[in-house]
């Protein structure tokens, strides 16, 4: 099942959010405010560690080896290059936004925990949000493309649109299989089964 968790990114405390109509839809532009920079930094610092290591992993290191070792565990997973740090942060913000502001969708895993190397970008769909129908147990998917740039230009939007259009606009089979496998590792069998059904039975 999908169990929501309260986001601690607190975007509304440090970002200005503006909705702009686009045909029958709208786009939401969120901009960090300079006057609230300290709040944004504090909120971000609180969420970043959990995207690279599970709470259980950190707690175990803390209990067995103490604070310096637990800190070293997280430090060893954080990217050291500016480009990868920026890209990872885009995925982290996207995940947190989905959980808090997407109208019921949830990102069921924090996929940065499974990076091959801290200074390598992960391949595949950036973030997949999932909404499960309480009656039918069928899933709806929110495919996400996270871009990290200094300025939101038309070119950035074009690149993001191209990423979203891959696989016919649907989540890739690889991305869904990856999520399903990780959910099995986490003993979330019902959601893993529902994803496998969507992929193999319903052919989304």
Identify the function of each model-found stretch.
Residues 1-66, 72-81:
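Nuclease-adjacent, charged terminal/linker segments that flank catalytic cores
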Residues 74-95, 112-117:
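A short, highly charged nucleic-acid-interacting micro-segment common to nuclease
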Residues 94-102:
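Buried hydrophobic packing segments
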Residues 98, 127-129, 142-148:
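Conserved catalytic cores of phosphodiester-cleaving nucleases, focusing on short active-site segments
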Residues 117-129:
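Charged, often glycine-rich, active-site loop that binds/positions anionic groups
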Residues 152-204:
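Acidic, metal/cofactor-coordinating or nucleic-acid-engaging core segments within structured domains
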């Amino acid at each position: 099942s999908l169990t929501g968790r309260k986001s601690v990114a607190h975007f509304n405390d440090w970002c200005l959010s503006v909705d702009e109509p686009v045909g029958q839809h709208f786009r939401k532009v969120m901009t960090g405010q300079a006057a609230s920079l300290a709040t944004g930094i504090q909120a971000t610092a609180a969420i970043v560690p959990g995207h690279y290591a599970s709470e259980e992993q950190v707690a175990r290191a803390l209990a067995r080896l103490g604070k310096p070792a637990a800190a070293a565990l997280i430090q060893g997973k954080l990217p050291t290059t500016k480009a990868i740090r920026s890209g990872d942060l885009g995925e982290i913000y996207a995940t947190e936004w989905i959980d808090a502001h997407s109208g019921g969708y949830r990102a069921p895993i924090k996929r940065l925990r499974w990076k091959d190397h801290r200074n390598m970008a992960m391949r595949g769909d950036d973030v997949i949000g999932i909404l499960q129908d309480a009656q039918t147990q069928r899933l709806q998917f929110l495919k996400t493309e996270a871009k990290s740039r200094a300025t939101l230009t038309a070119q950035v939007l074009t690149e993001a649109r191209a990423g979203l259009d891959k696989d016919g606009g649907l989540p890739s089979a690889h991305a869904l299989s990856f999520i399903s496998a990780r959910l099995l590792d986490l003993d979330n069998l019902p959601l893993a089964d529902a994803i496998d059904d969507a992929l193999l039975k319903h052919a989304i």
